Amino acid sequence: VKDGKIHSIGKITGEAKDIIEAKGLTVLPGCIDTQTHFREPGSTDTEDLHSGSRAAIAGGITAVFEMPNTNPPTSTKKEFQKKLDLAKNRMYCNYAFYFGATADNANELADLKNLEGCCGIKLFAGSSTGNLLVAEEKDIETVFKNSSKVVAVHSEDEEILNINKKLIKDGDVHSHPIWRSVECAISSTRR
């Protein structure tokens, strides 16, 4: 490491100039955040790939897996490539992106096996930001059957979410776990 940057990777020779006494402390390597929402493209007023990755590094995160529920969603090879292009030379950490599963692209997911920069398929069984909901059982099964990568699931029962929407209190963040309840997640996962 020179001037705060990795200069080379290889076998370490010699002794360290500085030794840090870490007795009684917890020492971790850089961590991996497997669920980031940097909201690019679409909502760069809140955060983007550049600022989000910079914040990740400041917090000890050296790699991120970014979610596909952006605007437009990262659910086609064209949009996936656009996201890779947006990230190139702008991110401070290692990164990979999830490819968003939809009912429309479920039969094409086997083609992603060697898609560079893709860490997996994201399946939204409950609605979230964007329009990536895959609520029908037959479509969920098709996603799993055809996926050539790990499938990460946003597991919430859409029917319960819709019933619970009346529990949302505008501007009250404390209503979030009431609306998106434990029952909602367990019901979806049991399916």
Please describe what each predicted stretch is.
Residues L25-R90:
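Metal-associated gating/positioning segment near the N- to mid-region
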Residues G30-T36, V64-E66, Y95-F99, C119-L123, ...:
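Hydrophobic faces of well-ordered beta-strands that scaffold small-molecule active sites
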Residues D45-S53, A103-N114, R191:
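Short, acidic/polar
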Residues T34-E47, T70, C93-N105, L132, ...:
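Active-site mouth loops of central-metabolism enzymes
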Residues V1-P29:
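Histidine-rich, glycine-flanked metal-binding segment
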Residues G59-I61, D85-Y92, E158-R190:
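Active-site gating loops and adjacent loop-to-helix segments of metal-dependent hydrolytic enzymes
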